[in-house]
Each structure stands twice: as C-alpha cells, then as structure tokens.
Amino acid sequence: YQQRYQELKILTINKFKNSDGSFGEGSQSGYAFAIELGLDDPKKLCALFVEKVKKDDYVFNSGIFAMALSYEILSKYGYDEVIENWLLRKEAPSYQQMLKSGNQVLAELFVGEHLSLNHAMFASYQQWYYQGLAGIKITDQAVGFDHIVFNPYFSKKVNDFTCQLDTKQGQITSSWHRCGHEINWELVVPVKKVNYQIKINNRYQEIKRISKNNQIIIKLIDSV
C-alpha cells in the first residue's frame, strides 16, 4: 500500500500542482486536501492556505469535507485565530448570518435559494472546541485516546472555557480562565492510562504548576 501511495502521490503532484504551489484550481479545498494527503511540506502549504483565506475576506468557502479538514489543519499548525475570525464573522456569508433567521439552527448552505434550513452540513466547527480551545489533540499513534497533546488556544474573545470528554481511558477535562494577562488552566487526565504531553506557546510564561493525582493546575502570563 505504501508503494502504491507513493506512485499515486507523484501522479497527483505532476497532474495538479501549480507553479505557485497551489493544487488544482487553487481553492481552499485544494490546499486542505493537499495538506491532508501529504503532497508537499505541510507548514508551507498551510501558510499558503491562510493567504488564500485572507484573499477570500476570511470566509471559509470549502465544501463539507474540506471544511472539516480546515478546522483540524489550521489549528494543528497554529492558525486558530483565523478560525476564530471566521466563526465570529457577522457579515454574510457566516454562521451568525444563518442564525439571524430566528430558527436557531444552521442551514445546509451559506448562500443559495434551494437548501434545507435545518441541516448539520457545516457543523464540523464543533471539533475546534475540543482541538483548538480545549487543546485536546490525539497523536497519530494514539489508540483509544491513550496518547494526547494538550495545547490550547487561549482566546482573548472569551474569558472562560471548559471542555469535558469521556474516553475509553477515563474522563479528560481542559478548563481555563483568563483575567487580563493571567490565565489559570486546569487539566484532569487519567495519568496512569494516558501518555500525555503539555505544550505551551512561547508567548506564555509559566508561573506555577501543581500536579496531584489526575489533576494539573498551571498558571500562565500572556506576554502579548
């Protein structure tokens, strides 16, 4: 299978890669799938992906499958703020524009006339609550949530966030509170069953860490 993958990878690159580094029609979907399939250096492709989103006025305009990939990929490579700007966008097309209809549910499409007004087609943003804001990311070698990296996006748009996840290994919680430049982050992880790693962006200075049983409390200072 690996040999066949390499053959198809070379074929796809030769057929669809453009001189500017994009793939296919140069769409956001093209970047998302190229990164997921490992067609080029992911960090370089992700930077180009973000430039494309900016050119599109920060609107995520992929289809159902690439949209889901976009949240995971952009968060993985540190572009959570781009995701946040899109989710909080008020002008059409946007999620908030969908909700202005008053029916309190998402529609099938952002634009168009023939569509369902109650459809979960673009509800994949929910994964970002877990992977981005909570920072709970399973690693490639994980089986049943037994390998996790904690690396949350401490948004400046919200002051409190709590995420609780029931897994085969036990309950995992990531909860943080922001007060000015201070951030108090609390983790609950079944330490005897889960191989975990805590990653903190260089912009944050760790002041204090307390670990007791399955609970970890970390105090940070945001330098930006």
Where are these regions (language model features)?
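Catalytic cores of carbohydrate-active enzymes
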Residues: Y1-S116
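Non-catalytic C-terminal accessory modules of carbohydrate-active enzymes
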Residues: Q2-Q3, E7, E81-V224
